[in-house]
Amino acid sequence: MMSKRFLWLAAWLTLFISGPVRAFDHTHRSWNELLVRHVVVSKEGYSSAVRYAGMQSDRAALKRYLMTLEEVSPRDYESWGKGQQLAFLINAYNAWTVELVLQKYPDLKSIKDLGSTFRSPWKKK
């Protein structure tokens, strides 16, 4: 009887201490929702443009998505298939680029204005 109680208590404490484990959303649903709301595709379908004013108003949602990216450990990333890894990298690159633009928005005319001749905007600390 005592050992069952001990095992139950140990299992409960393990769950309590470790906290909830959230699996990474490989559908990137929250990022896709932002894109649906704030990206306009050209009539021809060959290009698109971000509506940064709208994205700025949804910045809290963008930051929440970026936090989910930051929570991915190298071990988790390495356990994914190549397609999931590629989707993660592409979506992370694009989401962080939007965040970089929003840091200077609305005073920014072009993303190219973020850097300089000798310094990439992506190497900024």
Functional labels for PLM-detected ranges:
Residues W8-F16:
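Bacterial N-terminal signal peptides
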Residues K4, N32, N91-N94:
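Detector for Asparagine
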Residues M1-L9:
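Bacterial N-terminal signal peptides that target proteins for export
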Residues R22-T68:
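N-terminal mature-domain "stem" immediately C-terminal to a signal peptide or N-terminal signal-anchor/transmembrane
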Residues R59, R64-K125:
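Acidic/His-rich structured neighborhood in mature extracellular/periplasmic domains
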